[in-house]
């Protein structure tokens, strides 16, 4: 039986392999995602300067006002809409998607699709 620590270590190894190839620039920053059991986080990062340009999570006030759980697909969709809205307000319309070592399924896919529908291109 695979333990939680083993799964997380495997995910982190995958993420390091992905990070070697996926780099955010000033023209196309990186949209990275982190998923925990009860929450989901997304941020747009410029890897050249090492700065976070925009961030959204299931802990934001706008998210909490929607009265949705952060640990399900509906919550991930809401976070995807929030990150896209904030990025478009800052003039960012093209990003590179970094799934963070998670498989493109469930909450990760829901966040990505919602961000695409809200106007982000990747």
Curated annotation (Swiss-Prot):
Part of the 50S ribosomal subunit; part of the 5S rRNA/L5/L18/L25 subcomplex. Contacts the 5S and 23S rRNAs. Keywords: Ribonucleoprotein, Ribosomal protein, RNA-binding, rRNA-binding. It comes from Heliobacterium modesticaldum (strain ATCC 51547 / Ice1). It comes from the Bacteria. Disulfide bonds: none annotated. This is Large ribosomal subunit protein uL18. One of its GO terms (molecular function) is 5S rRNA binding. The gene is rplR. Pfam families: Ribosomal_L18p (PF00861).
């Amino acid at each position: 039986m695979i333990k939680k620590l083993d799964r997380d270590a495997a995910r982190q190894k995958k993420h390091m392999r992905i990070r070697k190839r996926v780099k955010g620039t000033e023209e196309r920053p990186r949209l990275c995602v982190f998923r925990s059991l009860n929450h989901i986080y997304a941020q747009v990062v410029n890897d050249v300067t090492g700065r976070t340009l925009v961030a959204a999570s299931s802990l934001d006030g706008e998210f909490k006002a929607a009265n949705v759980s952060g640990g399900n697909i509906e919550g991930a969709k809401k976070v995807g809409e929030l990150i896209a809205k904030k990025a478009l307000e800052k003039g960012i319309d093209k990003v590179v998607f970094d799934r963070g070592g998670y498989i493109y399924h469930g909450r990760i896919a829901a966040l990505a699709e919602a961000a695409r529908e809200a106007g982000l291109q990747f």
